[in-house]
């Protein structure tokens, strides 16, 4: 049985940091494998340094400006996902990640639906996200939920020199 647990930095901070390191290691390994890049060298940072440099805004997300969920399956943290409001009506889906052993079980779709539902409760009528071009399973989930490709948006956390390897998507509820 799965459970979505709202992130509490007093309880989950270390696990959330570990999940983000695992997520970033996966992102950069796939980026390098799919495009023959040495992306970390181009950024001049290690994965833990990148996570430490980018984690603080996530640790401060609180409803109704945003929320982070951890997906717990049989007592184990199986995945994560976040929503951050970019404006009164626009939310961004961020850091959707399932650990490899939990992929293919529908948890990504369930997490996305949870984040969209909460985003609507927070007043969002439009949602944005970015996803790697090689992440076909994730793209399928997003397209099935009504997301369509759009141009880059300035709030994306993807470094400008890596954006050509990502898709940017948006879903409008109107």
Label for each model-derived stretch:
Residues 89, 125, 165:
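Residue-level signal for beta-strand positions within conserved beta-sheet cores that form or flank
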Residues 102, 106:
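Glycine-rich phosphate-binding loop
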Residues 119-131:
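Conserved GNAT acetyl-CoA-binding A-motif
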Residues 3, 7, 128, 132-174:
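C-terminal "cap" of GNAT-fold acetyltransferases
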Residues 109:
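Residues forming the Rossmann-fold NAD(P)(H) cofactor-binding site
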Residues 5-94, 99-100, 112-114, 118, ...:
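Acetyl-CoA-dependent GNAT
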């Amino acid at each position: 049985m799965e459970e979505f647990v709202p992130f509490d930095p007093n309880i989950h901070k270390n696990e959330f940091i570990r999940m983000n390191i695992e997520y970033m290691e996966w992102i950069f390994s796939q980026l390098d494998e799919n495009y023959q890049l040495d992306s970390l060298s181009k950024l001049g940072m290690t994965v833990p340094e990148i996570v430490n440099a980018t984690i603080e805004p996530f640790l401060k997300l609180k409803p109704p400006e945003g929320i982070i969920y951890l997906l717990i399956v049989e007592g184990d943290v199986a995945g994560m996902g976040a929503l951050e409001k970019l404006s009164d009506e626009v939310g961004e889906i961020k850091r959707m990640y399932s650990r490899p052993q939990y992929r293919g079980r529908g948890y990504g779709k369930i997490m996305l639906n949870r984040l969209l539902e909460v985003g609507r409760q927070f007043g969002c009528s439009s949602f944005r996200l970015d996803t790697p071009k090689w992440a076909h399973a994730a793209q399928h989930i997003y397209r099935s939920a009504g997301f369509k490709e759009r141009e880059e948006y300035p709030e994306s956390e993807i470094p400008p020199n890596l954006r050509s390897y990502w898709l940017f998507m948006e879903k409008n509820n109107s």
